[in-house]
Amino acid sequence: MGKKRRKHDGSGSSRSPSPDRIREARNPSQAEVAGFRAPPSGKPAMTVKQLREERQKLLHEHFGYSNTNNPFGDRLLAEPFVWKKKNQLLQAAGQKGKTTVAALIHSSKSKVQEIENVKRRREEREKEEELMQQQREELQREKEREHYEEYAQKEELFHRSNQLKKTEIRLEQNRAQLIDLIVKGLRIIKGERFEKMDVLPGPPHEVLETYKNEPVTVAMLEDLIADVKLHIDVDTTVVDADFQDFWKSLLVLAREALERAKKRKDVLDQLARNSSPQMAAEAAAQLADTVCPQIRDADTGIVLSVAHEIEGLLGGKSAAELDELEAQIRSKFEEEDIDVAYWEGILNKIPSFRARAVCLQTWHMMTQSAADAEREMAREKALKEEEEAKAARAKGEELEGLLLEEADARKLARAQQIKQDAIKVARSVEKDVNPNADGSFSPELEPYDEGEVPPPVRGPYSPQLWPFDEFRHAEILAPDDDEDRRAILKKTLIQKERLKRAGLEEDPEPTPEAAENDASLDVLDPAAKVTTYEEFVKKEKKNLEADEEVMASSSEHKLTMHYTWEEKYRPRKPRFFNRVKTGYSWNKYNTTHYDHDNPPPKVVQGYKFNIFYPDLIDKTKAPTWFLEPSDTPDTVIIRFHAGPPYEDIAFKILNQEWQLERFRGFRNVFDRGIMQLYFSFKRYIYRR
């Protein structure tokens, strides 16, 4: 605002000058060119054409540009530029001097030089950037190389660990391969123990030819070589770090066995293609290694008879002796007049025999270590069985003492009860005979203490009076028979409990006498007979209803508790056999969308818990159960508590209301050592 637009005359420049004006500005007039005079040296003046040619020459030499060929599309690139307005202003101000040709040429050359410098700096900068890019790429390649090496190491370690796992799996499944038995033998040498201490059935150089009475195939040997390479030059495991010499020697033997197996396979294939008698004879000779002695050995270049002599020379030497022999032979090569072929043949055979010696020595170590380990394991097993037998005997003696104490306590309580009853009866009789009696006993009716012998009296006397209810439903026995029967029952009970504790009790066919004793034992002590877990489970599985399923072990809720009696008794987990009652809920939705051919999903309708406590210390207290909150509102924890020596056990069940009526299936009983809790859930029927 407030600025006035500048007026331009016809001779002035504008924002968008026309091409004619540009050309006019570029092409100097004759008057302007007339100012280009020669210097005082007397050289002729340069014309506009010469100046134009000079500029074209400079552009072409330094840049390769011309008026027709340049990246700018300028057809007047070589024309000198004259700034007319500037010259007019300078001339009007009296500041314009003469423009010489030398100044124009110098200005053009300086600009060309400046452009060259800029171009050179740009090229240097591009070279620096290219060099830096190469350095960055090299650094990136170095990082990738390190990463790849790390990745390769991890991959190799992964393959090794997989190989060890496959070895362990094949050993567990009794389908061990050669590499598995070799690794197992080396681990036995290092002190590891296995259930079966079996190693290679023979020396490695023999097993590589025949394994399990069959020739070792090419595929088996190739797999063995690949597995052996995984154990060379590594220290992943103990069998790798301490047996490198063995693995390298085994690789040598495996490669030789592979070559022989391939030759044997080629001979058999050739024989299969051509079964002529001559070919069969040649094949048999090659397979038996009984070719003519005049044929030279392909490996050593010596006669086979001499080769057999060399094998006899090297066969019985150890690895150290073979190393010493190799050093001596190499020193012989410096001497003159020696059979080079013979000694080179020996040198070629030494690595094979050295590998055989190393593997044979390691195999002897395997067999010896396995035998020692078996003897040690047998001795440990015998000691363990002896300790278990001692513990069982001690436990049986302890149980026998407890049972005897319990029997004596019951007998004493029974005697005291009989004495008290006799006193009551005697007092009632005395009251009936003499109403004025003061409650004291007469000499005839005074009861005697246990163990007290009554004094001899003359004439008849009254026996102790027993209540009649004691004998209403009992079997009357003679005193001697009663004592004998009680002694037999006690002995039977002690023997059965002792065998049961020791884990030696079997289930023989019950005899009539044993059945009678068991029945009498139930009468004597109903809580003494305990149903075993196996008997109960066998019976319950037979009676399993169609809508019942055995509760999964995952329903058990783990508890972490400490008990005050842990120092006296070793806590044990009770055994259980629980069932889940399932069924279909035929509500309105299910009846609409399902039928009996396509039923809805089953839902839990109840539970049946059977917890076994056969060895409770205090059998007078029945186990109890508690309901505790769970981690979800739809479930609840039911915990069973019995006391020593049993831990508490808990299960996660659905949080629904129970039916507590007996005719609805509710059962809460502790009988014969089994805590039984049966219940069903209430069913809600909604009506409009």
Curated annotation (Swiss-Prot):
It holds the Pfam family Cactin_mid. Its main location: nucleus. Residues 1-49, 431-454 are annotated as: Disordered. Residues 108-182, 248-275, 365-406 form a coiled coil. One of its GO terms (biological process) is cell differentiation. SMART domains: CactinC_cactus. InterPro entries: Cactin_C (IPR019134), Cactin_central (IPR018816). It comes from the Eukaryota. Keywords: Cell cycle, Coiled coil, Differentiation, Nucleus. Plays a role in pre-mRNA splicing by facilitating excision of a subset of introns. Involved in the regulation of G1 progression and stage differentiation of tachyzoites. May play a role in gene expression. Belongs to the CACTIN family. Homooligomer; the oligomerization requires the C-terminus. This is Splicing factor Cactin. It comes from Toxoplasma gondii (strain ATCC 50861 / VEG). The gene is CACTIN.
